[in-house]
Amino acid sequence: MTPIPNGGPDPDVLDEVCLRGELTVIGRIRSASNATFLCEAHLGERQAHCVYKPIAGEAPLWDFPHGTLAGRELSAYLVSVALGWNIVPYTIIRDGPAGRGMMQLWVDQPGSSLGEVGDEPASGPDLVDLLPAGHIPPGYLPVLQAYDYAGDEVTLVHADDIRLRRMAVFDVLINNADRKGGHILCGVDGQVYGVDHGVSLHVEDKLRTVLWGWSGKPVDDETLETVARLRDQLRGELGDQLCAHITSREVDALHARAVALLNNPVMPTPDRRRPIPWPAF
């Protein structure tokens, strides 16, 4: 990969490789509910790993129109870019080996077989973790009590981290129905990324997330200023961009959620029957 001064890959170069590179499928990610492939994109001497989800491989869902998940993933990325929070990895829709589909840059994580040699996972709890019942480390927030598969009582916790707090606000805005713990990735670059946004941006309330630790807490002023800018952009070029991938009703619903958060700047509470995605990890 083309290096930059700190020795890491240049994000702009990786974006270009993902957009224009020749794709080779390395393998299938079988834990995914839809057809999902790990690919290597080559452009000249440059290469990048990407996740490829062909539209033809999308499993039918009762509450989301068939063939729309790729557009929702791209729309979530566009919202992430507009917010300036760098939550969603670079995402496009392009042709691939199994037809047109969503393409997203792979996130190298510490300890991953695709990461750099020497990148080891940090010690201690993960950003989202299951711990023995009542064990809440400093800097963590409890979400719920549950039983694991062995029948032992556990506590679901997540870090009280600004990166996760922004992701929680992002999920409220895009109405994310599937924020599992495994959809939160710590990159070797120190960023925290959110992936798998195919079931988002519905007009009906479908928020399901493991990031409930801030329920009922006020949203800070800096975040509200960012949400206000998003609200305004949705009535301009951003709204037009999104309408190419989701319906105008869904764009209006996104705008309405931004307005609602600004009018009542408090994180929502889990008052629905199924507020946690299953499985949570």
Model regions and ranges:
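Helix-boundary and loop/linker segments of multi-pass membrane transporters
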Residues: 156-160
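Short, glycine/acidic-enriched loop or turn micro-motifs at the edges of active sites
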Residues: 174, 181, 199
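Alpha-helical scaffolds flanking conserved acidic
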Residues: 162-167
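Conserved ATP-binding subdomain of kinase catalytic cores across diverse folds
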Residues: 16-149, 153-154, 169-177, 188-195
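Broad phosphate/nucleotide-binding scaffolds in NTP-utilizing and phosphate-metabolizing enzymes
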Residues: 2-4, 148-150, 245
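Hydrophobic residue at the +6 position relative to the catalytic HRD Asp in the kinase catalytic loop
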Residues: 182-186
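Juxta-kinase regulatory segment immediately upstream of eukaryotic protein kinase catalytic domains
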Residues: 1-19
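C-terminal catalytic region of ATP-dependent kinase domains
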Residues: 65-66, 187-281
